[in-house]
Amino acid sequence: MPDSAKALPQSSTAASRSGLTYALLAFVLWGLFPLYFHALADVPSIEVLAHRVIWSALLLAGWAAWRGRLGPILAEFGKPRRMGFYALTTVLISANWWIFIWAIQNGRVLEGSLGYYINPLVNVLLGVVFLHERLNPRQWLAIAIAAGAVLWLIAMKGVVPWVSLSLALSFGTYGLIRKMASFDAMLGLTVETLLLAPLALAGMAWWMSTGQASMGHLGVTTDLLLLAAGVVTVAPLLCFLEAGLRLKLATLGIVQYITPTMQFLLGVFVFHEHFDHERGVTFVLIWVALAIYTFDALRQHRMHPSAGEAE
């Protein structure tokens, strides 16, 4: 998922309703990602990533041209310091996308779900370490419970849940750097995909020249799914940005749990992944931590309503 959109104050009930509709669309679409990437299980995950980058770059560049924003995007490439930040965020988002695709294709939907459940708490912890933000006792309690849940899983399974931790840390760090650099959400993703596009195109050229490309060899359905990678990536992002303009951040903070919850349900009931006692305890502890964190966030929002307004 992208960094949080800046919320603008809206008093209109109609705006709030449309904002909630956009938010539901965004998080439901993200929640359905396992179905999409699982349908591409016969395509190597790195090749799926390449298609996602190429078609997203084309779609985002077209969007920028339509909105008259090509100028600001091209101007970003002439700013060495900002390009340094972009280099970092590009590596992080590509790693995050690839790990998630790989996880879905290798029967680790539940691990992906866990990663996005703990992501908000990782964001809070990164804020403490790098932005020197201060936490109250309830927030520390939530983080401690989440850390305990991960340690419990490691102790019981004897294996580090690297998929979950990698997804949470890569996306959390991605959001942190974007916040520090004050990147515009859509403009930033456009620059990132344009930076990745040459590598993706080079990979595609290599696979085609060596007869390893999946496009055109695995059937029409697979071809259409690969071509849809750009729409699949950009559509929920656009919905999320529209929601961010109409809803308070506190509302978005609650609705965001739709995505990992849908992924959790898909992992258990659709893909029938193994869900034993150890995993059950881990998820329950994470849910308790998130309940504490969300309760505190809502309490803080009621005490300081302006915290959910635009920065």
Regions picked out by a protein language model, each given a short descriptive name:
Residues P2, P44-A95, S170, V191-M208, ...:
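Transmembrane alpha-helices of multi-pass small-molecule transport proteins
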Residues P2-E47, G148-M180, A202, P305-E311:
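Glycine-/small-residue-enriched transmembrane alpha-helix faces in small-molecule transporters
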